[in-house]
Amino acid sequence: MDFASRISILCFGASYAISMGAELLRFLWPHRWVRWIATSAALAGLFAHSLFLLHRGWIAQRIPIANQFESLIFVSWLMAMVYLYLIIRDRRLSAGIFVLPVTLSLVGMAAFITQNGDIADEDGTSVLSATHGLTLLVGTVVMVIATVVAIMYLIKLRQLRRGTVFSRVRLPALERLDRMNLAAVYLAWPLLTIGLGLGFMLRHLRVDDPKVITTLVAWLILTGLAHYRYQPEHRGQRVAILTIIAGIAVLVSFLGDPIFGTAHLQSPPTGEGRS
């Protein structure tokens, strides 16, 4: 683990930035070597990113998702894997210009957060606590994917209707994008529901905690979207817009700790239950 201990956010952040630059260049100049640079840089970044997380988990002897910094790093790692999966599955797909900005933004936010600034969950090694954190984070990633797919849907729709500056962007057919959106929404909802339910079961959450309020609001919006999507006739542009709204709500609940504050990770006074 000595080598892994020397890896910093700059290592994989720079790799993702190079990959993003190559994706933008590919948008203007679609040559094979540009795609190779984008893929290679992303693979190098994911390798360094994985070692960074493994080292942090090894040192702490737990899954590295116990505070805001680690959560940002973990979610950005999942998004990087999504990007690589998409471009390996379909080399012509313009996935990078949609997924990599999210990955880089999350890494950038983590870089400005003190790595040990949040108080880690004392029960972070328990199965239920780890499940609580993982289901919320994976559910957030799936909802981000649904939002990205919704944006792609709107761009594809505009391509078919008018043709725009994005005409060079290769996107799947509308029907496939709609199916991807449906699958992502139906996967995100149970994950976030389980994570939220475990959170209430494991902690005495305060209803006036901004973290709890924003998470509940996001869950209610997502629940409304999942119910709306259950109707077969509900699809198309309106569903895409509603998905983006729900995705923004989920992201606000995930990223809002430094802005709104929270008692979510703070230890209770001596002799009291955890909050």
Predicted features along the sequence, with ranges:
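Polytopic transmembrane helical bundles with strong interfacial aromatic enrichment
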Residues: M1-S275
